[in-house]
Amino acid sequence: MYNTTVRYREATPQLDVFSLLSHEQAVTQVVKGINKLSKVIDWELFREELESILGYAQRDWSKGGRPPIDPVLMFKVLVLQKFHGLSDEECEFQMRDRFSFMMFLGLHPGEAVPDARTIWDFKQALERDGRDGARKLFERFEQMLTEGGLIGRKGSIVDASFVDAPRQRNSRKENEQIKEGERPEGFEERSAKGRQKDCDARWAKKNKEMHFGYKNHVKVDAKKKLVTDYKTTEANVHDSQVFKELVDEKDEAVLADSAYLSEEAREHLLECNCEDFIQLKGYRNHPLSEEDKKTNKGTSRIRARVEHVFGRMSQMAMDRLRTIGKERANHHIGLSNLVYNMDRFAFLMR
């Protein structure tokens, strides 16, 4: 028979300021996820760069007008978004819903958070008129890592990974025109249809898998697994075509897979006074010798460390795009490399 005499503990009837403070203290005691970044990163490091990119440093504030949201706060919103692979709408909801997200942003319950449109506009502002904001912010953090002795350039690994864009449903004729660098009729940039079409992304095939989008070509510090440079291209661009743009005289040794092996690449390494550790490959009637195989085996163990970088990026959904166009792809890839470095930096500083 049902026992009506049992009494259970009741939930707190109403929230007050002390309940909220107690909840905040409980959350702050456990530092995990994105909040580990705030333990090791001084966000004010980016303020001057952000204000310069956005033109705030040159703006005449005496003319009035609605003041913008703090650019450092907006930058942290983008970091939060990339770290968790969120869309603009999802990011807005999660900032309102999750206390840990508000804590990361330095906000309190009840305070206004940037909406999806504001997030979109801020990303656009970083890249507008060739500002290349994501690149400049990446370089600012890379400079801090170098000055802190975390990037030694004793050995660098060069490799590339696909970043898939939303697939297009075009006719064969339209695809042929796009491949020739032309915009098909009705695909004008300002038209309703044109705004949904990516005429910059390209198809590529690797290991029997088809990819549509772009490539993230990176140079990674072999010891710390930090990205030191990157280049964005269409997916059909061969890895070897950007080798010279990534490798410079600052690198003491360079490791890469056999896709980068060419006389041009080796000449560039000689010009930069870099040790050559590009994987060797055999040819018809000229197979690899036992010594060559032994050399490849030794370097491949180190070169494989770059796959850990791409693996972590994939976990954070950085290997796919929600937008169209190369300019936005470049922003996504630049910010992805930056946020990966922040995550890696937090791991190294444990």
Model-predicted regions and their roles:
Residues M1-E48, S52, R350:
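Charged, often Cys/His-bearing segments associated with DNA-binding zinc-finger transcription factors
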Residues N35-V79, F83-H84, T118:
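Basic, short loop/linker segments at the boundary and entry of helix-turn-helix/winged-helix-like folds
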Residues D42, G65-L73, E111-D115, G298, ...:
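Secondary-structure capping and boundary motifs in well-ordered enzyme cores
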Residues C272-N273, D292-R350:
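Basic, amphipathic alpha-helical segments enriched in Lys/Arg and hydrophobic/aromatic residues
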